[in-house]
A protein has these predicted regions:
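The feature encodes the CheY-like receiver
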Residues: 54, 82
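Acidic catalytic/metal-coordinating carboxylates
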Residues: 31, 57-60
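As written
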Residues: 58, 90-96
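Acidic, metal-coordinating helix/loop segments flanking the phosphotransfer/catalytic sites
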Residues: 28-46
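Short amphipathic alpha-helix used as the core "switch/output" element in two-component signaling
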Residues: 37, 59-70
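Two-component/phosphorelay signaling modules centered on CheY-like receiver
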Residues: 7-27
Length: 129
């Protein structure tokens, strides 16, 4: 799942995930309300979460998701790569933290592949959400 208010950045994330994981099912949401509805109906295994969402921010949304769905892996993506945000992400129980600039880095896709394998999916031909 991709939770990002910028439709253009959401498309970049989806494009790159589909390029690396062609059969991955990618759910998207533009804000916390939409994300929560889709989490309850679609049960994603992995969430890319923007911090700067309209309304409820991504850190608070992460805390709420982890309270209800502790097994969901949440990767925080932000333009604000500062120690304060990293510490807040840890406090709010995010699993990983990346700057948006690092998204196209192969390390992010290696991490996603490793998460999918741990979740029991074939990362090359996954039907993971």
């Amino acid at each position: 799942m991709v939770v990002e208010d910028s439709s253009s950045f959401r498309e970049i994330i989806k494009y790159n995930l589909r390029d690396q994981f062609p059969s991955m099912v990618i759910i998207e949401a533009a804000d916390g309300v939409e994300a929560f509805q889709k989490i309850d109906s679609d049960h994603p295994n992995l969430i890319f979460m923007d911090i700067g969402l309209p309304g409820e921010n991504g850190l608070e949304l992460t805390r709420k998701i982890k309270a209800d769905h502790p097994d969901v892996i949440i990767i925080i993506l932000t333009s604000h790569d500062s120690p304060e945000y990293r510490e807040a992400a840890i406090r709010y129980r995010a699993d990983y933290f990346f700057s948006k600039d690092a998204l196209l880095n192969d390390g992010v896709f290696t991490l996603v592949k490793s998460i999918l394998v741990k979740k029991g999916f074939n990362a090359d031909a996954s039907d993971s959400r």
